[in-house]
Amino acid sequence: ATFTIRNNXPYTVWAAASPGGGRRLDMARIWGRTNXNFD
């Protein structure tokens, strides 16, 4: 399977809930997030 991941938000996506106050997401993590908006 091939997954194409695109960050539509105009900034780097960070996992704010990670220990240490957040870290850069790697390709192994996929968030259901579009245009940097949360529902």
UniProtKB/Swiss-Prot annotation:
Processing and modification events after translation: Contains intrachain disulfide bonds.
Keyword presence, Disulfide bond: yes
Protein origin, superkingdom: Eukaryota
The keyword Zinc-finger belongs to this UniProt entry's keyword annotation: no
Keywords: Antimicrobial, Disulfide bond, Fungicide, Pathogenesis-related protein, Plant defense
A GO BP entry: defense response to fungus
Family to which this protein belongs: Belongs to the thaumatin family.
Role of this protein: May be an important antifungal protein.
Name this protein carries in UniProt: Osmotin-like protein
